[in-house]
Amino acid sequence: MKAVRNLLIYIFSTYLLVMFGFNAAQDFWCSTLVKGVIYGSYSVSEMFPKNFTNCTWTLENPDPTKYSIYLKFSKKDLSCSNFSLLAYQFDHFSHEKIKDLLRKNHSIMQLCSSKNAFVFLQYDKNFIQIRRVFPTDFPGLQKKVEEDQKSFFEFLVLNKVSPSQFGCHVLCTWLESCLKSENGRTESCGIMYTKCTCPQHLGEWGIDDQSLVLLNNVVLPLNEQTEGCLTQELQTTQVCNLTREAKRPPKEEFGMMGDHTIKSQRPRSVHEKRVPQEQADAAKFMAQTGESGVEEWSQWSACSVTCGQGSQVRTRTCVSPYGTHCSGPLRESRVCNNTALCPVHGVWEEWSPWSLCSFTCGRGQRTRTRSCTPPQYGGRPCEGPETHHKPCNIALCPVDGQWQEWSSWSHCSVTCSNGTQQRSRQCTAAAHGGSECRGPWAESRECYNPECTANGQWNQWGHWSGCSKSCDGGWERRMRTCQGAAVTGQQCEGTGEEVRRCSEQRCPAPYEICPEDYLISMVWKRTPAGDLAFNQCPLNATGTTSRRCSLSLHGVASWEQPSFARCISNEYRHLQHSIKEHLAKGQRMLAGDGMSQVTKTLLDLTQRKNFYAGDLLVSVEILRNVTDTFKRASYIPASDGVQNFFQIVSNLLDEENKEKWEDAQQIYPGSIELMQVIEDFIHIVGMGMMDFQNSYLMTGNVVASIQKLPAASVLTDINFPMKGRKGMVDWARNSEDRVVIPKSIFTPVSSKELDESSVFVLGAVLYKNLDLILPTLRNYTVVNSKVIVVTIRPEPKTTDSFLEIELAHLANGTLNPYCVLWDDSKSNESLGTWSTQGCKTVLTDASHTKCLCDRLSTFAILAQQPREIVMESSGTPSVTLIVGSGLSCLALITLAVVYAALWRYIRSERSIILINFCLSIISSNILILVGQTQTHNKSICTTTTAFLHFFFLASFCWVLTEAWQSYMAVTGKIRTRLIRKRFLCLGWGLPALVVATSVGFTRTKGYGTDHYCWLSLEGGLLYAFVGPAAAVVLVNMVIGILVFNKLVSRDGILDKKLKHRAGQMSEPHSGLTLKCAKCGVVSTTALSATTASNAMASLWSSCVVLPLLALTWMSAVLAMTDKRSILFQILFAVFDSLQGFVIVMVHCILRREVQDAFRCRLRNCQDPINADSSSSFPNGHAQIMTDFEKDVDIACRSVLHKDIGPCRAATITGTLSRISLNDDEEEKGTNPEGLSYSTLPGNVISKVIIQQPTGLHMPMSMNELSNPCLKKENTELRRTVYLCTDDNLRGADMDIVHPQERMMESDYIVMPRSSVSTQPSMKEESKMNIGMETLPHERLLHYKVNPEFNMNPPVMDQFNMNLDQHLAPQEHMQNLPFEPRTAVKNFMASELDDNVGLSRSETGSTISMSSLERRKSRYSDLDFEKVMHTRKRHMELFQELNQKFQTLDRFRDIPNTSSMENPAPNKNPWDTFKPPSEYQHYTTINVLDTEAKDTLELRPAEWEKCLNLPLDVQEGDFQTEV
């Protein structure tokens, strides 16, 4: 019944249409869409139903990237008489696009206007549409013309790269038929295709002529039967069945072509009136295809749609028991017409371009609109707003002064008669170059009162006077006078003066006013804190620049950086004006090359990096205009233009522009506008792309992905960004941010929603630095991740799908991270703000946060930033700094006091260096505390910083000076006054030079800031301290290594004598040290040991103090520059206190010299005769005597019974080996022996070389002493011993000495001039004794020692000498006690038995030294630093001699001349002497001539008894000075 009802309704509506007008049929429309077909043939009457004026026929290309559609139109003469056929192609099946295409009349082919019978067309886009158009005067319904059935269309889908054999055969058939019909005219048969080669005869294809005819009026659907017809070679599973199953029996209505007539299964219009005819055709079709083996057709299926034009399908099966194939199709479809019209919903058209700003200056508004296609047949209207507004800001408008409201009228000026009333108004201040208010500021009018009596009347008030002060409250006044008072009348009531306050604002203090400044070629005038100062922009820009004067935390006014947000460069301004002019003229054609050129120019400008903050806003405005122009012109930018666009965005978002963005966004939030521009541009690019096409854009700061996806093709979730993509930038490849877009977001809920809009443009953008330039949020909330954007057009309908977003944190230490998205509907200015609505935080840890969001937007992570601890300046340093600096200073001051008390004992270069070092540290600590309280005073802070810089460097340099001094001491370098001056230059001069250079170059800029009094951490000024300090540490390490190498390596000592002694240092008690504190008795082995000890102490001091010093000053710098951290202050206090304690321990408590000096101080070790004993010792050192040394000293003084002063001179006199002279005295008066006498202190020394006798029992005369003929072979290995003699033998010395003998190493004995008392003995005048009066004073007897001479040390354990014993002619000899040395051959030989018998009773003056013997081993090897004290300054390290020597014990009587004149004949007695090694040897020296026979007696003295010791010593060197 329902079908009958629909049929009756259809017939009735057709009847009404025929009866009441034909013209109404012109409003009917129909459309046909053919897809999934590779070949077809349709007649015009089949394609367009009769009497339908607005019909289209559309063919869809399966894949435009692979296939092309070839169209052939066979035209008859009368087929196009009543209408026109238009053919065109397009990519998107959109009514708006088609209307726009028809309106432009671009690329539309008029098929009926062709003069040829055949028209060939080729198309490569998604859709081909043929439209039948009737003229405007079309009369209405017409009969069907037979020519319409003869004119038909053929189309072919052909592979572009490898065409199939079937396709080429069809093309060649078209060409063959065209050539036949045109009688060989080839110009009208042009088919532009080169992949196919047509044979000369069609039979070569292997297809008969009958099959060629079957290609007309047939449709081949794309199914399993025809799948192989699209490929060049058939696969095993493919067939190309062109067949007789599509053949149809001849039918006159459809035209006869050969033996058969083939009819395509065409779609029909919903308004076609031939329903019965269709049913008849179907019946005939079923009958004529009912061959044996083929079952009957099934019933037609239900119509695919409930409204509008749909389709019906029926099928049949083939039963062929004999193995034959069935002919004809097995599936058939037809168009079903449903009378119910489908509702057409209202559709928004595209947004119109943004209008120009509503105002040319100031805050304006831009508007865009869109229109809605009205709904039909009950469709829904359009949803959403019709207009859209957004703010715009081009430039600041000049603000003119505006009058405020008038005040109320004042009281009448008089109380009687006519007076006046006044009122005034205020004018607001003009800004940005605006004009002042125009017009009067006051008005007056008359007022009428009763007539006055004879009393006085007030005149009008005068004007207010100027304010007495400009600030801090002043006063202004006005006056009036009283007139008209009669004699009997009354005076005016009231007062004639009125006063009021003015200028009540507080005057700024001098430190609250920013001084005049010159910056960036602009002069900034004095401005109170809180105000803005304005200036013109630089010459290359237009606009105004501003600079704010603000107060610091300490209440001091200071200039901020200038703001260039209103400055626009001339190049940017010119580019902006050129675009606005084109937009105003409406030149759409500029969208092509014009906009591309604009982006290239803007790219060049942004790559220069020298733009202002205002240029950023102009660049965003230019990009907005370019995007709007592309949208308006429907222009698709080229790939180069797209890349340039995103490169411009990357340049604008560079991290270097962070400060410029912060400055620019104080006027307008350009970063938010930039995000919106990028989204719009992405969709413009995406709409111009083909399906399944994607574009990946990668720059230094932006990664973007643009994809065009049909909804049905999205089978998996989409991930962004793609880490493994080729060419991915490093920061995006290493990024841990990602977003997962679910596939369900593209899939509609039901298949009924699939329409032409089911193709989506997906855009995703990852910004690297956008979080840095977004507007600052309140409540210490910051963007703590990269910003990622996901956008899809058209927007998908709301689903239950969630976007999975995972973002990595940028900063550690933030609190409460949470997910947000950008919501532009919550802001009053249409710019938007961050919102948590629609986004929830799923999982968060210390480095990542995972979110689930139900909408598309811009996503990020917000977190709470910990609040900074602001430490207010209290005007006093912290307690920690005070404690640390105080303890360090206390320790160093204690050290200085100790050194001052013991200075006479420990004065040396090392002590002077230490005092200077302590002074630099104490000064640094004091300046650190001062700098903490003077940050508000710039001049004092700058001065404090400069001195702090100086003393910090000085402390490092004095450590280096100590290392240098140790190195020179170890290597034995001579240190003169010039060298000591270099110590001062290194310790104080080098830091002063560095600081002066730094201050000169920087002009004190950076010396002190608003927060601390130290070198600024910006600009590299800190390297003025770090660089020299690091260099000092490096050099100190090198010197330390060299010193250590010298101390541990004997081969490292170049000096022969030092090297020899270095070999003896392995035995610490190898020698005996004799120190007579007042007579200058010292040991030669003491120098090397003491020098090494001091060097090791200095080396250990450098290794400990220098790292501690570096740690202390490093923590001091951190404590001064970062007051918020208490850790650095604690570290400084610990290191600084430890530094002072270590210095006191190393240089005071553990230093041996200080210990000895302190003991001596407690024992009052001072000369009782001369309190000032410092001049008696080398280099001002007070010799600290041990018990043994005191015994020697007491013995010496008990005999002398007088001042030891002369002995001191003799002590100095005895230093003859390479002493250090004054630097202001040059060596002069050098004798032929190479020894300078005039320069020695006292000028009393000369020497005589006395040859050693070969035999011990042979007497020695003065003639033998004066014999200069010395054998070279005997002198090469000899050693020397010096004895004080008189000056009258100086000539003899000169004759004896030879040049080669002067260079020999020598040992010395210095005899004092006044230390021995000599008296002649009247009883023994005939006896020849050596007396000090006959023996020349102040002379040195130089003895040559035979290297072969040896002594037996055990024999001399006990030996006493008697000066009263008479000497025999040859047996009794002058005996000398010798000490055995392994390094030196002893030079005395005699029969030990003759002298061993000497007893202590024979010599009354012999003193037993048993107490000294008991302590002999204790003081056998005491090392000391030998220094000399000259008449102008202290001498430096004294280089000792490297020779073994023995001390003369006493002199005896000299044998007579007769005994001495009997030498061995023909032989030198010295040459024949062969001493036995088992005896202790003595040498008898005949000093005087035979003519000098004065009998002298050499009395034993106390000091001689000190020396008369059986010294049992081992290998070692020592030198005794008396």
From Swiss-Prot:
<feature type="disulfide bond">
    <location>
        <begin position="357"/>
        <end position="392"/>
    </location>
</feature>
<feature type="disulfide bond">
    <location>
        <begin position="412"/>
        <end position="447"/>
    </location>
</feature>
<dbReference type="InterPro" id="IPR017981">
    <property type="entry name" value="GPCR_2-like_7TM"/>
</dbReference>
<feature type="glycosylation site" description="N-linked (GlcNAc...) asparagine">
    <location>
        <position position="779"/>
    </location>
</feature>
<feature type="disulfide bond">
    <location>
        <begin position="372"/>
        <end position="382"/>
    </location>
</feature>
<comment type="similarity">
    <text>Belongs to the G-protein coupled receptor 2 family. Adhesion G-protein coupled receptor (ADGR) subfamily.</text>
</comment>
<keyword id="KW-0325">Glycoprotein</keyword>
<feature type="disulfide bond">
    <location>
        <begin position="427"/>
        <end position="437"/>
    </location>
</feature>
<feature type="region of interest" description="GPS">
    <location>
        <begin position="819"/>
        <end position="869"/>
    </location>
</feature>
<feature type="disulfide bond">
    <location>
        <begin position="482"/>
        <end position="492"/>
    </location>
</feature>
<dbReference type="InterPro" id="IPR057244">
    <property type="entry name" value="GAIN_B"/>
</dbReference>
<feature type="glycosylation site" description="N-linked (GlcNAc...) asparagine">
    <location>
        <position position="937"/>
    </location>
</feature>
<feature type="transmembrane region" description="Helical; Name=1">
    <location>
        <begin position="881"/>
        <end position="901"/>
    </location>
</feature>
<feature type="transmembrane region" description="Helical; Name=6">
    <location>
        <begin position="1099"/>
        <end position="1119"/>
    </location>
</feature>
<feature type="glycosylation site" description="N-linked (GlcNAc...) asparagine">
    <location>
        <position position="241"/>
    </location>
</feature>
<keyword id="KW-0675">Receptor</keyword>
<dbReference type="Pfam" id="PF19188">
    <property type="entry name" value="AGRB_N"/>
</dbReference>
<feature type="disulfide bond">
    <location>
        <begin position="537"/>
        <end position="567"/>
    </location>
</feature>
<dbReference type="Pfam" id="PF01825">
    <property type="entry name" value="GPS"/>
</dbReference>
<feature type="domain" description="TSP type-1 3">
    <location>
        <begin position="400"/>
        <end position="453"/>
    </location>
</feature>
<dbReference type="GO" id="GO:0016525">
    <property type="term" value="P:negative regulation of angiogenesis"/>
</dbReference>
<feature type="disulfide bond">
    <location>
        <begin position="514"/>
        <end position="549"/>
    </location>
</feature>
<dbReference type="InterPro" id="IPR001879">
    <property type="entry name" value="GPCR_2_extracellular_dom"/>
</dbReference>
<feature type="transmembrane region" description="Helical; Name=4">
    <location>
        <begin position="982"/>
        <end position="1002"/>
    </location>
</feature>
<dbReference type="Pfam" id="PF00090">
    <property type="entry name" value="TSP_1"/>
</dbReference>
<dbReference type="InterPro" id="IPR032471">
    <property type="entry name" value="GAIN_dom_N"/>
</dbReference>
<feature type="modified residue" description="Phosphoserine">
    <location>
        <position position="1220"/>
    </location>
</feature>
<protein>
    <recommendedName>
        <fullName>Adhesion G protein-coupled receptor B3</fullName>
    </recommendedName>
</protein>
<dbReference type="InterPro" id="IPR000203">
    <property type="entry name" value="GPS"/>
</dbReference>
<feature type="disulfide bond">
    <location>
        <begin position="819"/>
        <end position="851"/>
    </location>
</feature>
<dbReference type="GO" id="GO:0098839">
    <property type="term" value="C:postsynaptic density membrane"/>
</dbReference>
<dbReference type="InterPro" id="IPR036445">
    <property type="entry name" value="GPCR_2_extracell_dom_sf"/>
</dbReference>
<feature type="disulfide bond">
    <location>
        <begin position="361"/>
        <end position="397"/>
    </location>
</feature>
<feature type="glycosylation site" description="N-linked (GlcNAc...) asparagine">
    <location>
        <position position="82"/>
    </location>
</feature>
<keyword id="KW-0812">Transmembrane</keyword>
<dbReference type="Pfam" id="PF00002">
    <property type="entry name" value="7tm_2"/>
</dbReference>
<dbReference type="Pfam" id="PF02793">
    <property type="entry name" value="HRM"/>
</dbReference>
<feature type="modified residue" description="Phosphoserine">
    <location>
        <position position="1411"/>
    </location>
</feature>
<feature type="glycosylation site" description="N-linked (GlcNAc...) asparagine">
    <location>
        <position position="105"/>
    </location>
</feature>
<keyword id="KW-1003">Cell membrane</keyword>
<feature type="domain" description="TSP type-1 2">
    <location>
        <begin position="345"/>
        <end position="398"/>
    </location>
</feature>
<feature type="modified residue" description="Phosphoserine">
    <location>
        <position position="619"/>
    </location>
</feature>
